[in-house]
């Protein structure tokens, strides 16, 4: 059924709802879009609604400025009913469909250096139906020799890949399936904000760690928190007091019975980030089987991978010499461990050969 709340229309795959009392809609860089609702209901429908609400879809449309454009699509995650001052309310929490990518931690490797980043992304998303990605960062670049997803959800892994280009994973919360922008898109509707009240922030630590080394001026690290009385689209480029800025976060919420639109605006050149690494691999080793040898290097089939993908650009790992008095390269079919001395998988080396049929020492 459909309910109208201020300038928004909320459509839920539920019946028997009376009125929306409160709403909070949030979105930002590297985040799923989230929606919470407080809805007045009849007492006798309380238990039925809580039971029926699991995985129900929810759509929010903006009626005033965009003439019904979808601003959020997702599905319910948590539902509860409460009695307050003699009335019964349903409390709902929903997330964009990208949340499905963030539920299960997975481990696998990508060792074919001929793969592009987008080919890896498509492989990662292949199990999510119509989910997809729009590339605004890679320019068709190939991966380094080796990528490792280890005990990471697909969302976290893709977020980390985006950081290889100094950019972010941005949820497209308007689609009825999981979709993202890989990097900040260039979207403009000609919006101009003049003489708006705001607070300005400048993250000098972020500037020193990320932007300064790229030759970006310090003023590019500025961002503005603005509150307006109308809807702005996420990721759109607009003119703010004569400055070109991008909408990088929003929070629509109820305040004293009114719907308040709060946004963060940032200069495009300042929307950069450090390379994200996987803290879980530091000092870790993964069992593998030797598939090929070349000098003091080996190609391996990781135990975490269902099959070995042979190619001309499959990663060779250097085999580390563990003893100065005795040196013997492992044979094909031998068991080894791939050791990760730090948080970056690119530093991995092969160690500790075990002949087939022998136990680990």
Range-by-range predicted roles:
Residues 1-361:
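Amphipathic alpha-helical and helix-coil boundary elements used as assembly
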